[in-house]
C-alpha cells in the first residue's frame, strides 16, 4: 500500500481502513469506497515496523490496540491498530497540512484565543469533527505571534507545530510522559505560558488543567461533547458530589470560552459548524449557581461572539434550503 499514491489519486481521502485479508476501504467525501488491493498480513508488519515505536508495539501485542502518528511529505497520518475477530485491522486518519486547508471562518475568535495570557479554553465535538485541526490552528497562531513557551500533551502527536516566535515542546503520552495528569504536573515545572491537552479524559486530568489555568497559564483542551451548553455539566459531573461545588467555583473563575463544532457533509461539500460559549459574568454566575440549563438563552443573544449551533447553521452560505432543513432536523 502506498498512501501517497492513494492520496494523489483520491485527494479528498480522509481515512483508510484495513482488515487483514479484505480489500482496502477509503473514506472520500464522507462515504467509504472499496479498493482492489487486499490488506495482506505483510502490510500490517510493514506498518508496525515503520511507524509504531517499540513501546507501542509491545502495547499492541499485550492489549490488542495501539496508536501512533507519522509524516508523509506535507501530510501527517494518525494510525490506530486493533484486532477484530482475531484479524489485524487498522484505521489511518489523514491530517492535511494546515496551510493547504481552507480558511477558518472564525479567524477573529481564533486570534482572540491565541492572544489570551491565562484561563481555560475548550474545543469540543464528536470524533472527526476537526478538534485537532482547530487546536493546531490556534497553536500555529501563537507560534507565529508570541515569544512564549508552549507545552503540548498528546496521544499521539498529530500536527507538528512549527517553531517560529514560540518555543514549542510537543510531548507524547507513553513516549515522553506516562499520562496526561503527570504531563500537566511536569509542565508546571517547565516555565510554560501555554499548555495544550490533546484530550481531557478523566477527573484527574480536568482537575490538573483547572489548577494550571488558575495559576496563570493558558490551558487549551479538548472534550468529547457535542454542544457547548453541556460542557459545564460534563466537567462538574466528572467529579464526586463532595467536590462538585469546588469544581463549579474553579470552572466559573477560569473558563474563558468553549468552541463546540461539527462537520456537515453533503456530496463533495463540507461545512464546519461551530457554536461558541463565552464565559461572561452572567454565564459564570449560572455555572457557580448550578443553573447551566439557562446558558443557551445567553448564547442566543449573540454577546461576546456567542452563538448556538442553530444560529451557526442559519449563517451557512452555499447550502440549499433542502440541505438546511435536513441539517436542522439533525440538530433537534
Task: Please describe what each predicted stretch is.
Residues 1-332:
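Short, flexible helix-loop junctions that flank or precede catalytic/ligand sites
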